[in-house]
């Protein structure tokens, strides 16, 4: 059973692995098939699900909601995360992709997510990306309104720098619950730019997206040395796959990230969560780091 973890001093409690529904529309599941998939990952202990208003051309939330309408009892077994703040050209009114973080948009987006997801509350709402035009007071006002109305229980951000995180936190009477960021052997800037250090300082756990590098890990010739090293470490750890080793590498970070799994195949979800049992040494971790970057530590 997947470990549970309190991700910030004021909560919430999530499963250590998160089921990501970004590519739900690519899985070609019927609502009944999706119910079965949800039940299977809940039974593994993966109870936290990650959404965003824009996923699947603004369709993923509603598709998930149709499944919950067929099995509404599943809602009490899960924690739902969603995001807002990006506007894409998948909607006719948007002639250009842009960010929008004003008060009314955040409230309207959250309320639409509740309708789409067939639920009366979100466990966590994130601002999807930093907005150069973000007024922190407006965002805070929207968050406080949604919190007081009971529509959203916790709030956080995604892809924010430490300064952006601190700015928004300075306007809020409650703690931001997470910063959802890209963490992977093939994407390591956050290990040194202060993002994870800030979260560790605040005892806030990051959510980690694209742990497998969005396919680059498997398809990019540049990362062949990394694949080779992962295979060696997999053998040393008796791991079932190099994917498991990558998840173990992310889990080894002291900021205690929650990896987001993006596969609609339950066998891959099952394999991913087994990474919790792998005990990666410090030297194995640094070997993987070196293989990905191509150079040793200074």
Curated annotation (Swiss-Prot):
Q: Where is it found, in Gene Ontology cellular component terms? A: cytosol
Sorted UniProt keywords: NADP, Oxidoreductase
Question: Do you know which InterPro entries this protein is assigned to?
Answer: AKR, AKR_Detox_Biosynth, NADP_OxRdtase_dom, NADP_OxRdtase_dom_sf
Q: Name one Pfam family in it.
A: Aldo_ket_red
Keyword Cell membrane listed: no
Instruction: Name the top EC class.
Output: oxidoreductase
EC number from the UniProt entry: 1.-.-.-
Q: Which GO terms describe its molecular function?
A: oxidoreductase activity
Report the leader peptide range.
Answer: none
CDD domains xrefs? AKR_BsYcsN_EcYdhF-like (cd19092)
Which residue positions are annotated as catalytic?
Answer: 55
Its biological purpose is as follows: May function as oxidoreductase.
Family listed:
Belongs to the aldo/keto reductase family. Aldo/keto reductase 2 subfamily.
What's the protein here called? Oxidoreductase YdhF
Native organism: Escherichia coli (strain K12)
């Amino acid at each position: 059973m997947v470990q549970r973890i309190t991700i910030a001093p004021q909560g919430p409690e999530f499963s250590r692995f998160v089921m990501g529904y970004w590519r739900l529309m690519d899985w070609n599941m019927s609502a009944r098939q999706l119910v079965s998939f949800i039940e299977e990952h809940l039974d593994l202990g993966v109870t936290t699900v990650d959404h965003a208003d824009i996923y699947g051309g603004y369709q993923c939330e509603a598709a998930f909601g149709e499944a919950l309408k067929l099995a509404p009892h599943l809602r009490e077994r899960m924690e739902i995360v969603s995001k807002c703040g990006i506007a894409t050209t998948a909607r006719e009114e948007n002639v250009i992709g842009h960010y929008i973080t004003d008060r009314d948009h955040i409230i309207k987006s959250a309320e639409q997510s509740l309708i789409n997801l067939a639920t009366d509350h979100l466990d966590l709402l994130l601002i999807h990306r930093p907005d150069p035009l973000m007024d922190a007071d407006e965002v805070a006002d929207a968050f406080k309104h949604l919190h007081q109305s009971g529509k959203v229980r916790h709030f956080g951000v995604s892809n924010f720098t430490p300064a952006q995180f601190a700015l928004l936190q300075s306007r809020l009477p409650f703690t931001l619950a997470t910063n959802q960021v890209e963490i992977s052997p093939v994407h390591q800037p956050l290990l040194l730019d202060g993002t994870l250090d800030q979260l560790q300082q605040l005892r806030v756990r990051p959510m980690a997206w694209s742990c497998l590098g969005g396919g680059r890990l498997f398809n990019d010739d540049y990362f062949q040395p990394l694949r080779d090293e992962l295979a060696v470490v997999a053998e040393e750890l008796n791991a079932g796959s190099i994917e498991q080793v990558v998840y173990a590498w992310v889990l080894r970070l002291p900021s205690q990230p929650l990896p987001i799994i993006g596969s609609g195949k339950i066998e891959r979800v099952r394999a991913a969560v087994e990474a919790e049992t792998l005990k990666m040494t410090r030297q194995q971790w640094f070997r993987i780091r070196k293989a990905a970057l191509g150079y040793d530590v200074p």
